[in-house]
Amino acid sequence: RVRSLSSSLWTVTHLTALHINDNNLSRIPPDIAKLPHLIYLNLSSNKLRSLPAQLGNMVSLRELLLNNNLLRVLPYELGRLFQLQTLGLKGNPLSQDILNLYQESDGTRKLLNYMLDNLAVHPEQLPQRPWITLKERDPMIPTAMFTVMCYNVLCDKYATRQLYGYCPSWALNWEYRKKGIMEEITHCDADIISLQEVETEQYYALFLETLKERGYDGYFCPKSRMKPLQGKQLILVANAHMHWDPEFCDVKLIQTMMFLSELKSIAERALSSMGTGSLTSDPASIPIVLCADLNSLPDSGVVEYLSNGGVAENHKDFRELRYNEALTNFSCQGKNSSSSGSITHSFQLKSAYQGSLMSYTNYTYDFKGVIDYIFFSKTHMSVAGLLGPLETRWLTDNNITGCPHPHIPSDHFSLLALLELHPPVTSSSSLNGLHLPRPQVVGLQPLTSDPFEA
């Protein structure tokens, strides 16, 4: 019978099952965590008196058998095994409290939840995300500088152990998370804040009252709104949250087209209300800032449509479904000619975060990627600075498999951009800059995924 394990075993990292039961092992080395793909681990019928805390890092485990050993205590790190379905503990001299919990109905899940909720959290605080300056302001050019924040706060309704089993229940609780969320918002101190997944009750009880004290006006309404600034120029700020299911890329693309079609109508009404004071009837003449959780990756049809001004009618994201006739109704440049074969819009938009600056804005166990965006009218604005990403090494060093986390209150990271708004073209030879004083603006996206609610 085996008394010790060879270190070469930890190099076989592709293993998904390991049977080392019925041996004379008295300890399991911490290096067992170097087998990250293990789904099944049988350590039963050995002479184990303790388990390494690193066993809790093996979050792929579905079955862990520890029957008939000499275990008196269990490391609380086992609570991190949120995908574990079977935990074998029979035949161990464990404390009666542990055994009582384990022997209850759904005892494995209750025991793991208990250990996770009582696992000590490392006191190290979240490191500061870097500020990235892209350009300096030219004092000779009369432009307006303002900051825009986009943040999906993860509503309380969706913050469940079923969806986020790797997070302690106390750290999922809204009373705990709201403190970190407000700290994030107030630390960024943006001129314009766009929030997604805001519940009605929390809007009135938390966001509206707290942010009013800091000089913000709040909007919680069924459509995007524009706000005139000093009577000089309109700026249209829109906030959206698209459908979440990755299987329905066609739905997201159509939602986005409907969204821009509605923005076009809002811009046209704004220009009409300005009467003869407007030099143009082109809706794209109004600067636009679009903040959104698009639930779409940078290579998606949704982002292509926004960035390039259109997509082909036969784009793969339509999944070969026949949307042709319906789609022409959402072309912001009117019905397309048959030779065009594209659905287009006239807004010249650009994403503030370009390239691979952010590897992810949504960070969960099952998914890590960029799905949150700040778009702006590139003919009217430019980016002067951005809030950079959280250091990836901090996440890996602290074995954070997903968010939320006791130090991270949402499954999304906020975006913050410093935009430079160029002065509008006027009939006068002099240029008028745009001043953005307090009150600031906070736009809150209600809980539904209706793209018009912003």
Which residues are covered by each model-predicted region?
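Acidic/histidine-rich helix-loop elements
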Residues: 154-175, 246
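Active-site surface patch of divalent metal-dependent phosphodiester/phosphate bond hydrolases
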Residues: 167-230, 307-311, 374
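The feature encodes a structural signal of leucine-rich repeats
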Residues: 5-8, 28-30, 51-53, 74-77, ...
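Beta-strand-turn-beta hairpins that frame and shape the catalytic cleft
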Residues: 139-148, 157, 228-241, 381, ...
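Metal-dependent phosphoester-hydrolase catalytic domains
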Residues: 76, 96, 111, 122, ...
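Conserved hydrophobic beta-strand positions in leucine-rich repeat
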Residues: 15-20, 38-43, 64-66, 87-89
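Leucine-rich repeat
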Residues: 10-14, 33-37, 56-60, 80-84, ...
